[in-house]
Amino acid sequence: MATTVTCTRFTDEYQLYEDIGKGAFSVVRRCVKLCTGHEYAAKIINTKKLSARDHQKLEREARICRLLKHSNIVRLHDSISEEGFHYLVFDLVTGGELFEDIVAREYYSEADASHCIQQILEAVLHCHQMGVVHRDLKPENLLLASKCKGAAVKLADFGLAIEVQGDQQAWFGFAGTPGYLSPEVLRKEAYGKPVDIWACGVILYILLVGYPPFWDEDQHKLYQQIKAGAYDFPSPEWDTVTPEAKNLINQMLTINPAKRIMAHEALKHPWVCQRSTVASMMHRQETVECLKKFNARRKLKGAILTTMLATRNFSVGRQTTAPATMSTAASGATMGLVEQAKSLLNKKADGVKPQTNSTKNSAAATSPKGTLPPAALEPQTTVIHNPVDGIKESSDSTHTTIEDEDTKARKQEIIKITEQLIEAVNNGDFEAYAKICDPGLTSFEPEALGNLVEGMDFHRFYFENLLAKNSKPIHTTILNPHVHVIGEDAACIAYIRLTQYIDGQGRPRTSQSEETRVWHRRDGKWQNVHFHCSGAPVAPLQ
């Protein structure tokens, strides 16, 4: 009887130590190679939990990382498969994030920013020369090799990276992080290497003043700003930045990717290659202070999002301004975090770009000064809307959180479309409701007295005879939404729905139902194909 030989090369050659990162399918631990005593970071992926597509994604990331050998890129030293686990052995990067290091410095100038962007561009140039587009350049992926002064900047996390042939432009899927996405990606046009240069432009802008060039509470408005290239250089902070620095930013943030500066050209820009005579040496204390708040927002946002999602609440056009009812504990936790966010974010000095009327492009989406920027309440994590790209998983060796971003993005879509459906119900808008529902929608609901209802006619009756005639305010809160993603084009959501309304006698009432909805995506659009609602037959719940 033949015996199966199991590979134990990692176990034989490396000694594992403490955890330094953790995620959905993997953990990162410090390790030492026994024969040399050298330290590394081992990303350990539990392959028993991966789908075939996830395996392809892992192979692509390892293949790309093996290609890249540069002093400004976190290097992959080994890739080993053992039974049930895959080990990626990276540089052990101990200096933390570049942006966190900058705010701890006693002195920081335009010349320092020039040196930082030069190293980032050197890494990007190497990627592009090797036919690799990173697609997720952002502060979280810019690390320092060590805590030593003058340590090298290291580009990390190639979980979204793609391979391209030469200057090939194609649609590789909607991937990246909202504030750093290029106009061509947002327009869903063919793209390639220039997307990395656009992100470098955003990073350089932040390096110089401590806040981003594009921001809005509303992600749609944020995307409109980016597509229009609507940024500016407001006073007084930009008055002390040299014209050469602004010129480089303008060339990086050029809307047309064909006209955007390339990595090798940017490295030859006078502000980069002649920094000692061109870049200002003046200490930029205001930038450091703004950057502290920018960093704080990045760290805080995840906690806010997690807490707020637990009691996700929204209101429709005819609602009252009274807050939705929620559990005291959850409400307290959420409000505590929101107050923390406000204290960090509501002032220009806190790193929020002041909104001015003089924008580079008149199509800029305007926001009132003092409102929360998207980093506070909008997710600034990586998003993927194209299943071809597989699951985004941050390289744990970069000290970032690993998440199944593809699944996460789809779950957010399902919660959002469920909100839209309930909003249509509360508005009595049958047309909007019918667009979201499958024509053959099936349901078990109290109004049907336990019978299975199929089609839209049953629901149309309530819209035409009750909901459309209801002029009283309605306020709905979704509590504890749980989404199960079922393959690429199906999902199920379960939640508790609280509805506040005014009864016929003018008294405030609250009703509760437990609901489950099944969603199916057809032609790129999610449609509700079935729902099950508990409770007594009380309008206006359905």
Swiss-Prot record:
Family per similarity comment: Belongs to the protein kinase superfamily. CAMK Ser/Thr protein kinase family. CaMK subfamily.
Assembly and interaction partners: CAMK2 is composed of 4 different chains: alpha (CAMK2A), beta (CAMK2B), gamma (CAMK2G), and delta (CAMK2D). The different isoforms assemble into homo- or heteromultimeric holoenzymes composed of 12 subunits with two hexameric rings stacked one on top of the other. Interacts with SYNGAP1, CAMK2N2 and MPDZ. Interacts with FOXO3. Interacts (when in a kinase inactive state not associated with calmodulin) with ARC; leading to target ARC to inactive synapses. Interacts with CAMK2N1; this interaction requires CAMK2B activation by Ca(2+).
Residue numbers bearing the Phosphotyrosine modification: 17
Protein name: Calcium/calmodulin-dependent protein kinase type II subunit beta
Domain Protein kinase: 14-272
Catalytic reaction(s) noted: L-seryl-[protein] + ATP = O-phospho-L-seryl-[protein] + ADP + H(+); L-threonyl-[protein] + ATP = O-phospho-L-threonyl-[protein] + ADP + H(+)
Location of the active site: 136 (proton acceptor)
Annotated segments matching region Calmodulin-binding: 291-301
Post-translational note: Autophosphorylation of Thr-287 following activation by Ca(2+)/calmodulin. Phosphorylation of Thr-287 locks the kinase into an activated state.
Binding site for ATP: 20-28, 43
Gene3D superfamilies noted in UniProt: 3.10.450.50, 6.10.140.620, Phosphorylase Kinase, domain 1, Transferase(Phosphotransferase) domain 1
Activity regulation, free text: Activated by Ca(2+)/calmodulin. Binding of calmodulin results in conformational change that relieves intrasteric autoinhibition and allows autophosphorylation of Thr-287 which turns the kinase in a constitutively active form and confers to the kinase a Ca(2+)-independent activity.
Residues with Phosphothreonine modification: 287, 306-307, 400-401
Species: Bos taurus
The encoding gene: CAMK2B
Enzyme class: transferase
